[in-house]
Amino acid sequence: MQRNSVEGDRFSSMTDEQLVALCHEGEDLIPVIVSRYAYVVKSKAYAMRVDFSEREDMMQEGFLGLLSAVRAFNPQKNVSFSTYANKCIFN
């Protein structure tokens, strides 16, 4: 647990695009990105006003969408990672 805290501090000044680029180079920074986007995933799931088990499923799908966004993000498409990730989270 402390390791993630240290990593979070180490990478806190980096942009999402920089973190994703490092992921593409083989760095395991998924926990840092998930930590940054957890609020987005959870707030979108809670906005759906469904029961607890469905909300949990939606959050799981949202995090899978986020992971997909990390894998597929292409900075040459001239769109920010944040915009791309938000589209992937619940689409």
List PLM regions with ranges:
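Alpha-helical promoter-recognition and RNA polymerase-docking modules of transcription initiation factors
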Residues: 1-91
